[in-house]
Each structure stands twice: as structure tokens, then as C-alpha cells.
Amino acid sequence: MRIRLILTLLLLPACIYAQEHFPVRGRIVDEKGEAVEYVHVGIPRLGIGTVSTVDGLFEIEVPADTLEFHHVSYQTGYYPVSTPDNDLVIVLKESELPPAVFIGGDTKEKYLLRPGTRFVGAQGGFNARDGIDKGKEVGSVAKARKPFLIKDILFTVTSNRIPGCVISINIYRIEGEPKEFINILHKPIYADVAVSDGRQDFDIRPEESILLEPGNYFISFSLVDCDMDAVRMFQETPESERNPTDMELYTNIYFKSSYYRESSLAGLEYIPVNIGISVKGLEYQ
């Protein structure tokens, strides 16, 4: 019998829930007034977060504190909240692109990252039955020993029953102790995942040139969107009529350590397995 491993909810400190929470709703735009898609919104130190829609809309329940708005193409935004708000407009400023870096010399095509040994019969899943897994993140750790230019990011989804599923790939440089995860992307990487009970293999070639300096990196897979109308229809369906795998996405599990984020902007936690991301490209000699 196939084992389904669902990554479990991490308990938040009880003190978070002792504070009064209230709803904040709004829209996120750029300096031209155009919507900014899939912004991570929340309070990182409390582990509270969500992801805005493709239209930049967001809704979150928080205590009085400062909301943060994170997107790889924009400077981090901050907004203090102390009362409910139904019509908040957040304007994000575009980040400046770093100067191009050119490295001479010979290159060798190779894999920077491979999954490890597969945990046969086990799968890891994302659950969108309540829309709560938007922002959940898991991936793999890679070590670049020499400068490395990423050309392909590969992963497999074994089945997906989440309509409108969009995933995001992120790349973080790991620095310091305690570990700090710094997102090095300047352009987002998204992929649409079709509804299918069959295997789907993805080979993503980033639009921007991603040159890794020697060091440790966390390459992650995150759910950022799903069809909320489908979520509502699922919730209205009697439990006896639901398919056990409806509104769920599954991947294989591999024996190689990684990190896991329960929700958008929550802290990253060590886990002993990963979901099988591979990275290949050119290593400079």
C-alpha cells in the first residue's frame, strides 16, 4: 500500500494566539499602479503569512504589528497595522538589477544538485482544501564549490488534483550561524501544473542568468496559487462524495536533507528528506 506523507503543521507559540487578530485586506501594485502578483505578505517573526493573488489581492488576519511585503523583483514593503482594514493599497518599488557579471575560462556541464535515494512508496503532498498551503515551501540544499551558472531546474509532480495550480521556484544563499536564507533571484520563476493523475516532468530554464558564487544554497518549490472557486466548491461537497486526493498535489520523497517552511514568511525548519529537485548547468573551471 502506498504511503502518503503529508508534511505536518508546525505548532506556533501560544503567545501568538493570545493577541487579538483582525482582518486586513488590500491590493498590491507597482509604481505604475499595475498589480504585483504572488507577493508574500505577513509578519515573519510571528510565522504569519499568505500569498497575494495574481491580481495582487490579499487577505490576512494579524495582530497589531508591521506587515511585510516580499517579492524578488521589488524592494521589501512595510506597513504598520493596528485596526481592521478592508481597502489597503500597498505600492512596491522595483528593485535595481545588479550589474552583469562575466567570468572567463573554461566551463564544464554538470549537475549541481541531484535528489538522492528515493523513498520507495512514499510521497510528499501539498493540500489546498482550505487554500492554506499557499506559501508552503520545501526544497533541497546544494553546495557550489566553484562559480556555477544555472541552466535547468528539474522536478517531477507525480499527481495533481489542484485546479489552477501555480508553483514558484526560489533560490536562497545560506549564510551565517544561525543560518540566514537570502533570496538571490531578481525575476520570479513560475510554472503552471495541470490537473492530472499522471506524472508530469518539468524542466525550467530561468529567464535571468543565475550565477552562483561558491557556497551553500537552498533551491525550493512553493505553492503560490490555486483556483479558489474550486476550493469553495470542494468545501461545499459532502465529505462522502469527495475523492481522497482532490485538491492535493504529490511528489516523490528522497533521502537527502532539506528545509521546510509551513506557510509564507514562516521560519525554515530542517527536515531529513526532499522532493527531488535537480539543478544542472555550467561549472567554471
Show the residue positions of the predicted features.
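Short, acidic Ser/Thr/Gly-rich low-complexity loop/linker segments typical of extracellular
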Residues: 47-57
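Short Pro-Gly-centered beta-turn/loop motif in secreted/extracellular proteins
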Residues: 34-36, 59-66, 212-214
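A short, solvent-exposed loop/turn motif at the edges and junctions
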Residues: 68-80
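Extracellular beta-sheet/turn segments enriched in Thr/Pro/Gly and aliphatic residues
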Residues: 83-105
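Structural motif
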Residues: 19-37
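Aromatic- and Gly/Pro-enriched, solvent-exposed loop/edge beta-strand patches characteristic
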Residues: 165-243
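Hydrophobic beta-strand segments
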Residues: 39-43, 67, 102-103, 169
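Beta-sheet-rich sandwich/jelly-roll-like modules and their strand-loop junctions
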Residues: 98-174, 222-285
